[in-house]
Amino acid sequence: DAMVPALSGVSGRAAEPVRRLGWVYAPNGMAMDAWMPTAAESLKLSTTLSPLASYREQMVVLSGLAQGQAEALGDGNGEHTRATATWLNGVHPRETQGADVRAGKTADQIAADQLGRSTPLSSLELAIDQDFLVGNCDNGYSCIYMNTISWRDDTTPLPMENNPRVVFERLFGESGSTADRQSEFKKDRSILDAITR
């Protein structure tokens, strides 16, 4: 809710708190000494996590996990593709170069089924890269497995959006009028509340 201070004078009512959940995928890993908290009991945040200090009591930082379904399991090479495809679902993806992809519903979408019930968009799939590949990306695996980490169900990958303008318009409409958007903000205590109505 970083935008609350900028908009706090616009609203006089307290909105119902909305539960939010975020998943961050870092395909090439983390510098673990700058990522992991130093003491699990007190959750002394690392340099990387320190901007989230005000949420410390609401955080869970997991470590030591492994994704066995990302292993070859007889499919041969394709580790990068399988790592992306299995990250949030634990399902070994179907080895295919065609449209008959199959993985599994991801944890973010299971959560969105519950947390997104009272919001216009149950989930947002965002990316910072434009690397949308096509064809055979990794030893017999379709590129769709590398292009998305969220799956609505076993056969429906959810594309990620990396254009901030498109995301903004999806959330708040295509109105170019600042007055129209400001009118919408007056109904809520923060920009994030506008997407949870």
What are these regions (language model features)?
Residues 1-197:
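Ligand-binding pockets and gating/stacking loops
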